[in-house]
A protein has these predicted regions:
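Short hydrophobic alpha-helices and adjacent helix-cap/hinge residues
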Residues: 1-247
Length: 247
């Protein structure tokens, strides 16, 4: 219908402070803002806080309650976790066009994407995204992990490096990266020592010690560094700026 007002909804798997998400959200909003018959909205799933099924369901219900009177015509899903909403999307909003931007061309049960998930959950429960094409109207854009290229560059630029420290929070993809990075270093750079520093309140001082120590034998490989801490009123607060204290 010519001239019909359309709604675009961006569902971000992460929080609004995540640089990767904002690098995608901002251009979309800039492109759509001059178009009079399109309204673009953004909702953040805040995956850092989602550690169990109860929290996931609260988040899911919150999204669909918020947009029950302004159903989207198009969807952009940022991060593979957002694609776990696909059945609810199909049920409540219909088989609308979806653009999924993610790191993996696979899908898994929602518990696979929970923050701090058990380490024993393996990639064996993932399946190819292509299997879902007959059921859902989606286009997938992959933003692959670049850990191999980054490590190779670090080795070239830091010839004295003997240890690589992977500093990252408990988001599911960092658990995957931990395994992938460790395997890559073991196979290609067996003389390098590998350490994993998990982003949480207990390791805040350790992170600062690494960053303040000008040690050419240690290389820092960063991913996301977000974690939850309760404020004075007992409500969860997202901590995101630890590295900025000394960077």
């Amino acid at each position: 219908i010519v001239g019909k007002h359309r709604r675009l909804l961006i569902i971000n798997s992460y929080n609004e402070s995540a640089p990767w998400s904002q690098e995608l959200i901002t251009p979309i909003l800039l492109q759509t803002s001059p178009i009079e018959d399109i309204t673009a909205d953004v909702v953040h799933m805040n995956g850092t806080f989602i550690r169990n099924d109860s929290l996931y369901i609260r988040m899911e219900n919150g999204i669909f309650e918020r947009f029950q009177d302004k159903k989207p015509d198009y969807l952009v899903l940022l991060g593979n976790m957002a694609f776990t909403l696909r059945e609810r999307i199909l049920s409540e909003w219909g088989n609308i066009p979806i653009v999924l931007v993610g790191n993996e061309d696979t899908y898994a049960p929602r518990e696979y994407y929970f923050t701090g998930r058990p380490i024993h959950i393996s990639n064996a429960i993932t399946s190819p995204l292509v299997d879902l094409r007959p059921q859902y109207n989606f286009t997938f854009i992959e933003t692959p992990y670049m850990y191999k290229e980054t490590i190779d560059m670090m080795v070239q630029m830091l010839p004295k490096m003997k240890t690589i420290v992977f500093a990252a929070d408990e988001l599911y993809h960092n658990q995957d990266l931990d395994r992938l990075i460790h395997a890559y270093i073991t196979s290609k750079y067996p003389n390098l020592h590998y350490e994993r520093l998990i982003g949480n309140e207990r390791n805040q001082n350790e992170l600062q010690a690494y960053l303040l120590n000008d040690e050419p034998e240690t290389g820092m490989l960063f991913s996301t560094w977000f974690y939850e801490r309760k404020n004075l009123l007992g409500f969860p607060t997202l901590i995101s700026g630890d590295f900025q204290l000394v960077a």
